[in-house]
Amino acid sequence: MRTCKNGNSYEAANKLFTVRHDGTRRGGTDEKGSHWHGEQVMNYLMDRENSKDTDPFLIYYGFSHPHDVRDGKPELLKKYGAVNHLDPNILPPANPRQPPLPVNWLPEHPFDHGHTTVRDEVGVKGVWKKRDERTIRNEMGREFACSENIDIQIGRVLRKLEEMGELDHTYVIYTADHGMAIGRHGLQGKQNLYEHTWRIPFIVKGPG
């Protein structure tokens, strides 16, 4: 089975999955955010359990966060001192609980790298063209909130696999397609060749 955001997957590959769930948008609620993806996987595992299905399985768990728009859940945003900022005419509130600025933060990129006007650099809700400290720290808090929600949803699935007796013989692979600048080098998006963009996690856990 697989989950993904509608429009962000490859149809030829989708046809190989017998169970497919597409989220229609990213959001900061359980109905539209990472919890929704987790719920689809949990339902799939419970269906396997109830039907006593012992065939091998593949789950592609395709979260759409922390890609923008990084609308986090209220309780996680509060933990990281962030808000889902909506007004491009004012700065988000400062909060000491927000993550610090990245060590390589810059207020602007020092040269035109060829992608300074793409949507990722000028049109992301909550940041737009701003690179000031308050905006970037708030956006980092939103990213942390969205990333922690992914941790929570993966934890739900791992506990369910353990409860079913499946975890010890299941390979779990955690990776991503790209990173994101969020103020590093004065950039916001992914259209660049800095390490913060092309370096991604790759974690494998399983038997053997």
Label each region the model flagged.
Residues 24-31, 35, 44-208:
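Active-site-proximal cap/lid insertion segments
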Residues 1-2, 6, 11-25:
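Active-site segment of extracytoplasmic enzymes that catalyze sulfate/phosphate-ester chemistry
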